[in-house]
Amino acid sequence: DLFARVPARRKFLGTAAAESRAVIVLATHYALAYPGVSFQVVSGGRRALTTSGDGDIRHAFAAVYGAGMAAAMLNVEYAEGVVSVAGLAGPPSVHRGNRSAISVFVNGRWVQSRPLAFAVVDAYQSQLPGGRFPVAAIHIALPDEEVDVNVHPAKAEVRFRDERSVGRAVRHAITRALEGARPVD
């Protein structure tokens, strides 16, 4: 029992099922952040996640969301100033009822950033049905001095020196990927 000697920590734990879900969510995001690392998560005696670690983000995405969805994803690649954006974004036909399938990574770190999630959603403008959200795994790289990771104790939030330019780069990256996927009339 990990917290047997520290009862103050134990009281903040959720149920076993809730803690298991939190571990699976974390492992899922890091599998998408590091496709070159093999992940295997077993929960309740069953395999919840297995990735090959072959370095292909599309293969990691398939392990998380299924081969069909991975095949539908669009490649995202864009650079603007010191910001580079890469990853996968779904076409407008691939969407979810919440933002949980939007994974954003900054310099290899999974972050929960409302401005960046908004930039991803904003790139789709009116292409998604109301109340629906895109599926995406977006990797943002920029110099360390352009981002502050010491905003949250868990390092889950970041602050940018120029948040607008980072958001603009994300929007442009996804918009370009979507434009490249549209059929020509």
Where are these regions (language model features)?
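N-terminal phosphate-binding caps/lids of nucleotide- and nucleic-acid-binding domains
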Residues: D1-D185
